[in-house]
């Protein structure tokens, strides 16, 4: 096994982070799609709860945007913090009837999901993520720039295909 093969071999930690991200994001992406595809009914139900139309639209955007962010591993930390705060707000605003066992259960679930999101925000997406792919591309571009700058500084011509560049 070469060093390159070892570097690309996913570790259990990364597979666990991927699985956790996908499971956590599923809830938000599904709910965001449900609200968006049944918008009229969702607007009516949310209005009855005192939620304005702009807040409903923001909720859908947050659930879909941050949900995909966490699931794909793109700006995962930001998406996880946003969804964690959303869960805390949802728990505090909508699940306050502690005498009702169902409401108490929803409060506890929202708090647990928020906790998971905050742990994910600290842990990051792991190696199996778009963040990793994009960071790798940025690092390669920086290395290419440094190589070109070093060649220019050394006075060596650069060649691109058959064309020689004099700088």
What are these regions (language model features)?
Residues 1-37, 44, 53-65, 71-167:
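Extended, low-polarity transmembrane helix blocks
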């Amino acid at each position: 096994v070469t060093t390159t093969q070892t570097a690309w071999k996913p570790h259990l930690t990364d597979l666990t982070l991927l699985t956790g991200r996908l499971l956590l994001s599923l809830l938000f992406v599904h709910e965001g799609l449900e609200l968006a595809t049944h918008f009229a009914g969702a607007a009516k139900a949310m209005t009855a709860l005192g939620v304005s139309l702009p807040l409903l639209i923001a909720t859908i955007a947050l659930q879909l945007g941050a949900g995909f962010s966490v699931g794909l591993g793109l700006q995962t930390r930001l998406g996880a913090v946003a969804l964690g705060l959303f869960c805390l707000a949802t728990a505090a605003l909508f699940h306050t009837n502690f005498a009702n066992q169902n409401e108490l259960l929803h409060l506890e679930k929202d708090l647990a999901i928020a906790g998971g999101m905050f742990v994910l925000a600290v842990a990051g997406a792991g190696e199996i993520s778009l963040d990793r792919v994009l960071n790798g591309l940025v690092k390669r571009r920086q290395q290419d720039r440094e190589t070109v700058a070093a060649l220019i500084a050394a006075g060596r011509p650069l060649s691109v295909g058959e064309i020689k560049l004099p700088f």
